[in-house]
A protein has these predicted regions:
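Core RecA-like ATPase module of SF1/SF2 helicases and allied nucleic-acid translocases
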Residues: 2, 16-28, 32-135, 140-148
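ASCE P-loop NTPase motor cores of helicases and related translocases
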Residues: 4-9, 13
Length: 148
């Protein structure tokens, strides 16, 4: 995030049962702010490996319910290499930039890494991908795992 006022936001939730809905709603807000129908704008939701698939389903269900059918169909039809909305692990975003990035449960990302050096590299990659907005979404328990 390059000198944009209010570019880093944090959302801390009471428990894990709230994560999926919160991430889905925050994604809708980011899509409305950063994604254009002309194909410009990119948003990444970076999560622990075991959360990626179920989180992607939940996010896309929320997008389907919230966006116009035309806009949802346009986003849903995009190939994985050119998606405007990506739900992925840290490994998938290396070397890429996004207008907005949401990092979900960074403490778990760190905890699941095979070593401390890999954990540090993964979190560095995740948190340096956005050009305009970084949003960290986590639970109170995750915050105890890793202070940011």
């Amino acid at each position: 995030v390059r000198g944009v006022p209010d570019s880093v936001k944090r959302l801390t939730l009471a428990d894990e049962s709230l994560i999926f809905d919160a991430v889905a709603q925050q994604t809708v807000d980011l899509v409305r702010s950063y994604i254009s129908a002309d194909g410009t704008g990119r948003v990444a939701i970076i999560a622990p490996d075991d959360m990626v698939k179920p989180l992607r389903r939940h996010v896309y269900e929320q997008l389907r319910e919230t966006l116009s059918a035309k806009e949802f169909d346009r986003l849903d039809a995009q190939s994985s290499w050119d998606e405007q909305v990506t739900v992925c692990s840290t490994q998938m975003v290396k070397g890429l930039e996004y207008d907005a990035v949401m990092v979900v449960q960074p403490g778990i990302i760190e905890e699941n890494a095979p070593s401390r050096i890999v954990a540090a590299a993964d979190l560095y990659v995740a948190m340096t991908r956005p050009t305009q907005r970084l949003l960290i979404v986590r639970t109170n328990a995750d915050e105890k795992l890793l202070k940011l």
